[in-house]
Each structure stands twice: as C-alpha cells, then as structure tokens.
C-alpha cells in the first residue's frame, strides 16, 4: 500500500489548440504519474460529458477551468490517503462524487485525468511499465494498427463524407514492420495525390484531406498507393473505414445525406452500398455504418455483412457496458471502439473490453481527433491484448507518440512480443 499525497490539475492545450486537462498524482513513496485527456470532434450523444466552461471570453468558450477546479477542489481532497494501487476504489469514489449517469457534474475530462494519472503513479512506484502494471505478465500482444490516411467528414475541411479511410498492415510479421509498411503507403499516397494535382494538406488526425469525386475514389487512390509502395491490397494491407454516419444522418427525413456525392439514401440503400464496396474492395472493417440511434439499420448491416467484415460500434456503444450488452443481446455489430474519455475511468474501460471479448466481439483501442502527447492508450492496447489500435496517420506528433510508445513496448517485450495481424479479426469468416 502507498497513499496518494497530492493530486494537481492544470489547463493545457490539445492538438487542435483547444484546452484540455492534465493531471498529476504523487504518492508517499515517491510515485509520480501524469496524464493528459483527449477530446473528440464527432461525439456520440450518449458519451460521458466533457465539461467546458462556456465562457466566450476565453478560448471561445472551450476552457476547462471548471474541470480543473473539480479535480483540485473536489476530487483531490477526497482521494488524498487512498491506496494508489487500488484503481477500482479510486475510480468508484470519483463516480460516487459525481453522482450522475454520464459524469456531467465533475466532467469525464476531470475524472479520466485522475484515473489515468493514478495508474501511471502506481506503475512508476513499482518501477513497472504501465502496460505490465495494468495487464500483468501476459500483456504481450502488439495491436494491429488502423492508420487513418485520408480524412473527411468532421475531421477535415473537404467534400468527403466518410470520416476516415484507413489502412491495416495485417501481413506484417511484427509491429515494427507494420509501422514501416504504413509509413511507406502514406508517403506513396502523397505522391499519388500530388500527381493528380490534389491538395496534400493534412486533417486533424494527420491524414490527407483532398477534395475527391466520391467516397469510392478515396478507396481507389489508397489502393493505388498500396501498390505503388510495393504491397498487395487484400493480402499485405487491408482497408478500413470510419463512416461516422451520425454526422450526415438527417433525423427529420430518416435519410443519410451524402452531400459530397449529392446522394440521399435510405438505411437499406446505405447498407447495400456498403455491401457493394465490400464485394468490390478489400475492406475488412467498417465503423459506425449507421446512425447511433438507428439500431434497426445496424442490425440489417450486421445480418448482411457481419460474417465477413468487422463492424465497429463507436457512437453506437460509446465504450459503455450497458450499451454494449444491449448490442450483444440483439446481435448488432461485432466489435467495439474503446475510447477512454467516452466512459471516463480506466476500470469502466477495462470492463467494456472484457465484456466484448467474452461475447466474441473484437475491441479496438482508439485515440480522439483532439489528442495530446499522452500515449496511455498504447499501453492499454497491450495491457488488454486488445489486438487492434486506431491512433491516426503517419504524421503529427500527437499521433506518432502512440506509435513510438508501441515500438518501445515491442522492444521491451523482446521475444515474447506478438503481432497477430490478420488473426486479430478472430470472429470473421473471410
């Protein structure tokens, strides 16, 4: 046992220049932990609440001084004296202090900062890497990365409706080689886009954000880049998409408005469109294919292609075990996206991953579009042997920080390190 002696929060900036929360935790025996909290752009309406000040005179109303004060004035006095190694008790106390179902009182950004910083302090005191502290001796699987190399939707200022077009280097023997393959495809894509006279500026997550003729053209230019880099689509590298369809779903008409293509689709038409893309291209994963409240649409999509494509629930499940349990019961999707700030504590995050695995669902540990240099999610991915991680493109230090941490972890693990690649998709029949 080692008691927490000090907790301190401050306002910092994230990768979009918006304020976020940083928390430091100190223990009586010299343990120290620091954590920085991320922020999303396309957020699910059922996510835990990110507390913002609303004071238009500071940071356009996006300040987080209220959340910082909640850590320093409310949470800290209650947790001083707690055993830093008792993560469950720490998180449970903060949930109790908040007292709301969605952490609206104290803010998920306040609670999560303390939760992660406490884990870092505990690991530091024991002299252990965070992934070992969180996952034990069997934490050894490096995640297959989903690399977002074309950004659209809410993550870019372009005409592409779908939010993310990603590559997954499943044919690599190690994480290090997977990262190299992804970087080479990324650079090849820049060359392809430049050759087409298209913009090669990057979006929030480091991917390119060109104006394209259609969502399908994003797929074809990536396939060209994969081949240009010397790899085989559908063998060395597969594709994944985060459609983020809630962002273009019109509740008043019940239709999906693909403004970039001038199309208005019913749920059934959208599902048929996905099925056509999957038949035509090596797409292995689709995230949030239907609106977060269109559960009938998600069921239709799952029944149609769920046997051969990973269908990831992000806004659908919001890292929430009650939402996930409902999805499992109804046979909706087959994977969950794990975002620590959607739920707000490490214990609840780990509960969601465990529930998914027990049900035969995969779990994809994920960043947010507003990120920091914090690389905790890299350790979480290995600690839980999640098998997959989604942490942006091959540019922007806020994204690369996670990849570099995974390289360090792979080195530390040495010969016991595993990289499952295509085997990460263990619930598909493709």
Curated annotation (Swiss-Prot):
SUPFAM superfamilies to which the protein is assigned, alphabetical: Enolase C-terminal domain-like, Enolase N-terminal domain-like
Keyword Magnesium among UniProt keywords: yes
Residues annotated as signal peptide: none
Domain of life: Bacteria
Metabolic or biological pathway: Carbohydrate degradation; glycolysis; pyruvate from D-glyceraldehyde 3-phosphate: step 4/5
Protein's GO biological process: glycolytic process
Compartment annotation: Cytoplasm; Secreted; Cell surface
Pfam family, one: Enolase_C
EC number: 4.2.1.11
Cellular component per GO, a single term: cell surface
Cofactor binding notes: Binds a second Mg(2+) ion via substrate during catalysis.
Reported function: Catalyzes the reversible conversion of 2-phosphoglycerate (2-PG) into phosphoenolpyruvate (PEP). It is essential for the degradation of carbohydrates via glycolysis.
Keyword Cytoplasm listed: yes
Catalytic activity: (2R)-2-phosphoglycerate = phosphoenolpyruvate + H2O
Gene designation: eno
PROSITE patterns named among the record's database cross-references: ENOLASE
Protein known as: Enolase
Cofactor requirement: Mg(2+)
One of the record's GO molecular function terms: phosphopyruvate hydratase activity
Chief location: cytoplasm
């Amino acid at each position: 046992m080692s008691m927490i002696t000090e907790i301190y929060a401050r306002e910092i900036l994230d990768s979009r220049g918006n304020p976020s929360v940083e928390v430091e935790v100190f223990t009586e025996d010299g343990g120290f932990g620091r954590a920085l909290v991320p922020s999303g752009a396309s957020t699910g309406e059922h996510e835990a609440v990110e507390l913002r000040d609303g004071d238009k005179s500071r940071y356009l109303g996006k300040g987080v001084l209220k959340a910082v004060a909640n850590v320093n004035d409310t949470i800290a006095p209650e947790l001083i004296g707690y055993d830093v190694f008792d993560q469950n008790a720490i998180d449970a106390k903060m949930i109790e202090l908040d007292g709301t179902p969605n952490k609206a009182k104290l803010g998920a950004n306040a609670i999560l900062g303390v939760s992660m910083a406490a884990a870092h302090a505990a690991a530091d005191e024991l002299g252990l890497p965070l992934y070992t502290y969180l996952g034990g001796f069997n934490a050894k699987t490096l995640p297959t990365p989903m690399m977002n190399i074309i950004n659209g939707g809410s993550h870019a200022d372009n005409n592409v409706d779908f939010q993310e077009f990603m590559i997954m280097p499943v044919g690599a023997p190690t994480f290090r080689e997977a990262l190299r393959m992804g970087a080479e495809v990324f650079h090849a894509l820049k060359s392809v886009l430049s050759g087409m006279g298209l913009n090669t500026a990057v979006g929030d997550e480091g991917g390119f954000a060109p104006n394209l003729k259609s969502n399908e053209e994003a797929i074809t230019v990536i396939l060209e880049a994969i081949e240009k880099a010397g790899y085989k689509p559908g063998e060395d590298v597969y594709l994944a998409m985060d459609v983020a369809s809630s962002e273009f779903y019109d509740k008043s008409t019940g239709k999906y408005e693909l403004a970039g293509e001038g199309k208005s689709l019913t749920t059934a038409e959208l599902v048929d469109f996905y099925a056509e893309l999957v038949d035509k291209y090596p797409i292995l994963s689709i995230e949030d294919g239907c609106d977060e409240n269109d559960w009938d649409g998600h069921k239709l999509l799952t029944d149609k292609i769920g046997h051969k494509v990973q269908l990831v629930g992000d806004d659908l499940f919001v890292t929430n075990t009650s939402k996930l349990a409902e999805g499992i019961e109804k046979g909706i999707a087959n994977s969950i996206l794990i975002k620590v700030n959607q739920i707000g504590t490490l214990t609840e995050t780990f509960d969601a991953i465990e529930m998914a695995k027990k049900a035969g669902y995969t779990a994809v540990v994920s960043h947010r579009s507003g990120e920091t240099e914090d690389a905790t999610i890299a350790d979480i991915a290995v600690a839980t042997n999640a098998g997959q991680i989604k942490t942006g493109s091959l540019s922007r230090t806020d994204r690369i920080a996670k990849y570099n941490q995974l390289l360090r972890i792979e080195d530390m693990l040495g010969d016991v390190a595993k990289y499952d690649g295509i085997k990460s998709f263990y619930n598909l029949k493709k």
